[in-house]
Amino acid sequence: MTEHVNAPLGTPIVAPIHHSAAYAFASLADARAVFAQRASGYTYARTGNPNVTALESAVTKLERAECAVATSSGQAAVTLALLALAGPVNGHVVASSHLYGGTVDLLTDTLAETGLTVTFADPRRPEEWEAAVTSQTRVFFLESIANPLADLPELETIADIAHRNGAVVIVDNTVATPHLFTPGEHGADLVVHSATKYLSGHGGPLGGLLVDTGNFDPTEDPQRWPWLTTSHPRWGDRSPVEVYGAKRALLGVARCKYLNDLGPCMSAITAHEILQGISTLGVRVERQSATAASLAATLNRHPAVARVHHPQFGGARQEELYEQGGYRGTGGVFSIDVNGTPEQVEHVVDSLRLIKLAANIGDVRTLVAHPASMTHCRLTPEQFRASGITGQTLRFTVGLEDVADLTADLFQALSVIADATESPAAWEHLPHTARATAHQQKDSFHDHH
């Protein structure tokens, strides 16, 4: 006889990890219904897992959106979005000229081999986006805060142009995070994240998310999106709209076709780790944003720095976009143009001690990158010029270290070119807006392009 043992009192405050590749069904009828997508449930971990679902739900709420699909990386999330929107018709994409270099590689090389075409446009000049539209344009792609130059786009105007021309707006919200900006409230139809960065926050797990804000409805122009609105054997002779609903059809296709067939899925352990990171997102991002603004203001006075790329030094229009565009912070990424030769730039990088040289952002550790040699090294000369990056540009992604320690490290590294002419301590009592006003004497890249 087996003795009955009562369940112990108390429940875990952290959700358990469901580390299982497959799921058992009570009956064949249940399995048949789930696999035919006539009932909800899990079929195989490639398309769903309880931990992954929890992460998707959390990010959907943060973005104030409709639904989300988690992927193995941010690149995978972008790829699924573009395949689901432009792949079936060899569509055309209008993309920001100030994108992360890996996204440029994806657009101009790998996806170009599938028939996708792209035209780049300045995110600060909506007229360039209007001029780039063709009859095949299906997607506008841009970043809410650009990586690496941290400029803000004319998002609402650009989104209006896209929607007038039947295009879907995808916004990469990795740098801003939903804590600082929610693109769906400003015209975005889809939002993508490299969850590796700020959502995770500790430089460990690799993951991505594709989020549908609920603004895109393919039934408003069904002939433009037939792979979403017409029946197909893949969906049991139904359309994705019939299976998932108009506002979830796109991500239904992204998950059950492209994620299922290509396999860039997120593991249960990764989803669990990213969810733990999200629990401290607000605290981390607010500190990183404040520290980045302080460092940018300090470096704007340094004789070894020719220019600072940060929204508070981007000129009047950038300030207006920040104040009126729905931003709740400027993020933890900024860049500088070093006032020196290529050899001196390299010496500055190699002289940093606390700040590490690495190709990542959003870590609790402050990192530096040389975009021309690293993240943007495969750009063509034309793309490189349009990006605003130079061989003297250094990108910083600010962590959680003390601002005084970071300032000291930057000053000792920059001293190979010139010593600071004043102590940053004189500015510490000023709020960030006052520091920005005091430092506005240097020319901005945005004032001359």
What residue spans do the PLM features occupy?
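Short conserved active-site loop signatures built around small residues
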Residues: M1-H18, L210
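Conserved PLP-enzyme active-site core in the AAT-like
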Residues: V5, C67-R301, P424, H429-P431
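Short loop segments at secondary-structure junctions
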Residues: A22, T213-F216, V338-T341
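Conserved N-terminal alpha-helix of the aminotransferase class I/II PLP-enzyme fold
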Residues: A22-T79, A84, G102-T110
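Short hydrophobic/aromatic beta-strand micro-patches
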Residues: V211, S335-D337, T397-G399
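Conserved small-domain helix->loop->beta segment predominantly found in fold-type I
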Residues: L262-A271, Q276, T280, E286-R287, ...
